[in-house]
Amino acid sequence: MNTCYTVITGGYDTLKPPRIISEGWEYTVFSDKFIDVPPWGCIVTDKHNRELKIMPNAELFNNITLYVDGSIEIIGNLNKFVKEVPNRYASCKHPHRTNIMQEAEAVIRLKGCSRPLVMQQIDRYIDAGFDEPLAECCVLLRNLNDPVVRRINKLWHSEWLNSCGRDQLSFGYSCWKYGLKPYLFDQVVFKRYFKLYSHS
């Protein structure tokens, strides 16, 4: 059984039922309060949403796992999606920015992050030799049976926890450190299976 999951806390988003319920998938929402939207099963938790996004619970999940942001509606068949997209580790190519320097400027300008803190993180990545395309981590397709994927998640979690707190900045670096190039699908593929809404 594969798992699709999302995280909604603080009333930040409205959970949307998938337009198509895909055979062989279970749907799980983590939230700080109970949400009743079938076919989603709800697990009430006090964990931070980014922690659940980055480090899915190995006791609950194995095999193929799909994370979607709470602002996303699933509109396509997930079995077709995993046939189209390599499932070791995949995410969406960022539609507006191409690299972490552009993302750094965006989180400073739009999210109010500390410039010195962000640039300290970015400089460390660039000095290490990192220069990979930018992902938009609103969708994450992972094979959690893969030990390299689990190690990447652990490093990504550590980078998120000990830096400026913007997970997209450290995703690509964490994959690169373990020699894994994530598959980044484009907006044509994204729009075939998902619909993005503004945060409620």
Describe the residue ranges of each PLM region:
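N-terminal anchoring/stem segment of glycosyltransferases
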Residues: M1-R50, E59-I64, N162-R166, K177-L180, ...
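A residue-level signal for conserved active-site and pocket-lining positions in enzyme catalytic cores
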Residues: C4, Y27, N57, S71, ...
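A short acidic, amphipathic alpha-helical/loop segment
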Residues: K16-P18, P56-E59, N77-V82
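Residues that flank catalytic or metal-binding motifs in active/ligand-binding sites
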Residues: E23, V68, A135-E136
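Short beta-strand-to-loop acidic/aromatic patch adjacent to the donor-nucleotide binding site
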Residues: N62-E73
